[in-house]
Amino acid sequence: MNKSVIFFIITFLMSGSALAEKIRFSTSATNPPFESFDDHNQLSGFDIDLAKALCKRMQAECTFTNQAFDSLIPALKFRKSDAVISSLDITPERSKQVTFSDPYYENSASVVAKKGLYSTFDDFRGKRIGVENGSTHQKFLQDKHPEIKTVAYDSYLSAFTDLKNGRTEGVFGDTVAVHEYLKTNPQLGTAIRKVTDTDYFGTGLGIAVNRDNPALILKINKALWEIKHDGTYNKIIDKWVPEQDIKN
């Protein structure tokens, strides 16, 4: 092959790679099965696979950064990331700060505690419930149930450790996430099931981007629609959130 032709092909391929959009995702890998570190210390989970599928559809180069949950939106606003995917509830309060994608998962919240002791929020009066710091679960308890002692943690893992050791009486979080811990903690059960107050838990989970980046949110929404219609989304759901895991 002519050397000039080879040079042209290489240049074309390199320019295509250089022109590929780069999207920096941030997440807080403390919330399996949505996001956590696997046995090889790699980010994995429903949100991670979803973001990768969206990037593939958008033909974008995507990277992921792990950070504390309560720093995700501030970091996005200061342009340290381009998008946040971390099981974020789409709420009116958050929507004042960022732009959300279309919902990608219908979410609810549940309280986990030792079996047989609690069944209503009133049962937890004067008791301690662990939440992730900066979460909608924290705000819900503080606003709606000040009679309950809200204890904030940097991760669900820390919250469940204290619950198992008797330092708290419950953990309040995403239904799917708290059910993940029940698999390996048979002494625990669901005390309060599937709270769906839309003022706090919104209309589902969404991907957050800067309010001044409408082009990116349009691309994400288009890619999300496409993977929901070509079967990719259902495969990710079946892998990470089997329906039988959240029925009870």
Task: Give the positions of each predicted feature.
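Ligand-binding clefts/hinges and TM-proximal coupling segments of bilobed small-molecule sensing domains
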Residues: 139-153, 189-195, 222-248
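Short loop->beta-strand "edge-of-pocket" segments that line small-molecule binding or catalytic clefts
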Residues: 23-29, 121-135, 149
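Alpha-to-beta junction loops
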Residues: 59-61, 77-86, 128, 146, ...
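Acidic, polar ligand-binding/catalytic clefts
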Residues: 52, 56, 61-123, 187-200
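Extended ligand-binding regions for polar small-molecule ligands
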Residues: 48-57, 117, 123, 127-128, ...
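Short helix-initiation/N-cap motifs at beta->coil->alpha
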Residues: 31, 48, 63-74, 116, ...
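Periplasmic-binding protein-like
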Residues: 29, 105-112, 175, 179-222, ...
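Extracytoplasmic small-molecule ligand-binding "clamshell" domains
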Residues: 21-87, 230, 243
